[in-house]
A protein has these predicted regions:
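Hinge/cleft segment of the Venus flytrap/periplasmic-binding protein
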Residues: 11-13, 19-31, 184-185, 275-320
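Extracytoplasmic "Venus flytrap"
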Residues: 40-59, 63, 67, 72-85, ...
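An alpha-beta-alpha
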Residues: 41, 45, 60, 149-191, ...
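Short, solvent-exposed amphipathic alpha-helices that sit
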Residues: 52-69, 146-150, 173-191, 205, ...
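Short beta-strand elements at the ligand-binding edges of bilobed clamshell
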Residues: 73, 130-153, 165-168, 196, ...
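Hydrophobic alpha-helical segments within soluble ligand-binding/sensing domains
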Residues: 83, 139-163, 175-176, 203-207, ...
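Hydrophobic alpha-helical
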Residues: 97-116, 181, 192-195, 200-260
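Flexible loop/hinge segments that line or gate small-molecule binding clefts
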Residues: 105-145, 156, 162, 256-264, ...
Length: 320
């Protein structure tokens, strides 16, 4: 009797172990099949040393992962050659969609032709690509409008000015902002650009560059910066030079959360606010529409000017 029970329990244990093994295999097989059906998306920004691009990447990732897919992001750190190699690497990895934010507006034709040959959908974000024929869609802010908004505020709040420009000419979005500003002040001879310099839109570069311009042109009383990080660098230089908030009008583009405090304190005059959250989300949604066979559509989002008069409106403490 004891032997019979022992055999019976042994048989039941064997069946139980076999069932567990089958269940584990089924789960593993399901996981493998899920991984095989997940689509890869790639994103290559000009830099991630800017919270603006971190927010865009965060929004794209949220949409992609909600679809059960994968986003691979790369940071070429403002190096055009490295960006091209990062793009080639993502093409080799088999991405279906590539979001690009070019370091420069040129030199992309060869690698974008490679993306097209590999049937990769390319979507430009935050800035236009010179080789637009290789791009399925572009999602940007109205960059010329952003510069023009800053100029319009300046013209209505000052009788004249000696202006310094902080630029990033290789980035088309930045160049368009400065061009929008220049065009708007061109009809007002009391406003003159007396100094301009490149800063790649980086705070740590803008600060010493601004200090040099102030030393060479102490008459500067207006600063137009391509973005808010550059404006923050300019403000740091102005403070180091002993300027007070009322001495210099400072304009930027982006709407970084810190800009609100600087506007309240009088150090920053205004910023043309972009919405990196909408840019990222809409770029990702556009990618899925194209994958579904729908017609591609370029998107240009309006900017709005943030000043001391409206700085406390809709202040959620973060990005738009």
């Amino acid at each position: 009797m004891q032997k019979h029970l022992s055999w019976r329990w042994g048989f039941l244990l064997l069946v139980l172990l076999a069932g567990i093994a089958c269940a584990q295999f089924a789960r593993m097989d399901c996981s493998v099949r899920q991984n095989e059906t997940r689509q890869k998306f790639g994103a290559v920004y000009m830099t991630m040393n800017n919270p603006f691009y971190e927010i865009i990447d965060e929004e794209i990732r949220t949409v992609v992962e909600n679809h059960g897919d994968v986003l691979i992001s790369r940071n070429p750190a403002l190096n055009a050659d490295r960006q091209i190699e990062e793009i080639r690497g993502l093409i080799a990895d088999g991405v279906r969609v590539l979001f690009i934010n070019p370091v420069g507006g040129t030199r992309m034709d060869t690698v974008l032709a490679e993306a097209r040959a590999a049937r990769v959908i390319v979507i430009a974000i935050d800035t236009n690509v010179a080789e637009e024929g290789y791009v399925a869609a572009t999602v940007v802010s109205e960059n010329e409008r952003a510069g023009a908004q800053c100029a319009a505020h300046l013209i209505t709040h000052a009788d004249g000015g000696r202006i310094a420009l902080l630029k990033h000419s290789e980035a088309r979005s930045a160049a368009q902002r400065i061009e929008g500003f220049r065009t708007a002040i061109a009809a007002h001879p009391s406003f003159q650009v007396v100094a301009e310099a490149e800063c790649s839109g980086q705070l740590e570069i803008a600060m010493p560059v601004m200090a040099d311009m102030l030393a060479a042109h102490p008459e500067i009383d207006v600063v137009m910066a391509l973005n808010d990080p550059a404006a923050l660098g300019a403000i740091a230089a102005l403070q180091s030079a002993g300027r007070t908030p009322t001495d210099t009008m400072v304009y930027g583009v982006d709407g970084v959360p810190e800009s609100r405090d600087l506007i309240r304190a009088g150090w920053m005059t205004a910023t043309a606010v972009q919405s990196p959250r909408r840019i990222g989300r809409m770029a990702a949604e556009e990618a899925y529409r194209i994958l579904a066979g729908e017609a591609a559509e370029d998107i240009a989002l309006p900017t709005r000017l943030l000043t001391v008069g409206n700085v406390d409106e809709n202040d959620g403490g973060g990005w738009d």
